[in-house]
Swiss-Prot record:
Record-listed Phosphoserine modification sites: S11
Family: Belongs to the histone H3 family.
Residue positions, PTM N6-methyllysine: K5, K10, K19, K24, K28, K37, K80
Gene that this sequence comes from: HHT2
UniProt modified residues of type N6-acetyllysine: K10, K15, K19, K24, K28, K37, K57, K65
Keyword list, A-Z: Acetylation, Chromosome, DNA-binding, Methylation, Nucleosome core, Nucleus, Phosphoprotein
Function field: Core component of nucleosome. Nucleosomes wrap and compact DNA into chromatin, limiting DNA accessibility to the cellular machineries which require DNA as a template. Histones thereby play a central role in transcription regulation, DNA repair, DNA replication and chromosomal stability. DNA accessibility is regulated via a complex set of post-translational modifications of histones, also called histone code, and nucleosome remodeling.
Descriptive protein name: Histone H3.2
Quaternary structure annotation from Swiss-Prot or TrEMBL: The nucleosome is a histone octamer containing two molecules each of H2A, H2B, H3 and H4 assembled in one H3-H4 heterotetramer and two H2A-H2B heterodimers. The octamer wraps approximately 147 bp of DNA.
Residues bearing PTM N6,N6,N6-trimethyllysine: K5, K28, K37, K80
Length: 136
């Protein structure tokens, strides 16, 4: 007879657990009676990777136009009241703001990867800004 390789098996030891007949029967009958199907869920990270690919392909602006315009007007009001903006000026500001944020998040992600992490943290943003020579 040929030798077979032995594999380690987990043994619980001690007494065998007592069977609970009432709860098992209730569990088996519940799904068939209700017929409620669990909603489909993707594994963690799948949707995130899909969104990354989607937004890297696209060129449209990601910040909504009106909230950004309100923010620009609110900030400008601190410097001078009754300022008017051409729509093209607000669009140029939004383009440059989004380009800056994308670039900052790229550098932040590199800082997180350098620290052997996949999750970005505020200290990564601080490091990226410091390396760029920006004020903190």
């Amino acid at each position: 007879m040929a030798r077979t390789k032995q594999t380690a098996r987990k043994s619980t030891g001690g007494k065998a657990p007592r069977k609970q007949l009432a709860t098992k029967a209730a569990r088996k009958s519940a799904p068939s009676a209700g017929g409620v199907k669990k909603p489909h869920r993707y594994r963690p990270g799948t949707v995130a990777l899909r969104e990354i690919r989607r937004y890297q392909k696209s060129t449209e602006l990601l910040i909504r136009k009106l909230p950004f315009q309100r923010l620009v007007r609110e900030i400008a009001q601190d410097f001078k009241t009754d300022l008017r903006f051409q729509s093209s000026a607000v669009m140029a500001l939004q383009e440059s703001a989004e380009a800056y944020l994308v670039s900052l998040f790229e550098d932040t992600n590199l800082a997180a990867i350098h620290a052997k992490r996949v999750t970005i943290q505020p200290k990564d943003i601080a490091l990226a800004r410091r390396l760029r020579g920006e004020r903190t």
